[in-house]
């Protein structure tokens, strides 16, 4: 059974949380690289901060993914690798 926010014992308005969105090079977890990370930190319905960066996946972006996301190989080529991005995201 899936738990609800009521199960936390804290009203949702008092909970600080982050919503994270990833764009990747494909659909299978073992064969993909991250091309973009976006995050929003929220508390009580207020935005406390945002984070967004392109990520160099170290692999080619298939044309179908470029059509879907608008992210091209040229856009991610100068971007940092995921190893460099994660510490900044976790701050």
Residues of each region from the PLM?
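Conserved non-catalytic scaffold segment of RNase H-like nuclease domains
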Residues: 1-91
């Amino acid at each position: 059974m899936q738990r609800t926010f009521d199960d936390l014992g804290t009203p949702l308005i008092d909970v600080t949380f982050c919503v994270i969105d990833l764009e990747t090079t494909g659909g299978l977890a073992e064969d993909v690289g991250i091309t973009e990370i976006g995050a929003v930190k929220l508390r009580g319905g207020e935005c406390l901060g945002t984070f967004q960066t392109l990520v160099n996946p170290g692999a080619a972006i298939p044309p179908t993914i470029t059509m879907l996301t608008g992210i091209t190989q040229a856009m991610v080529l100068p971007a940092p690798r995921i190893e460099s991005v994660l510490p900044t995201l976790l701050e």
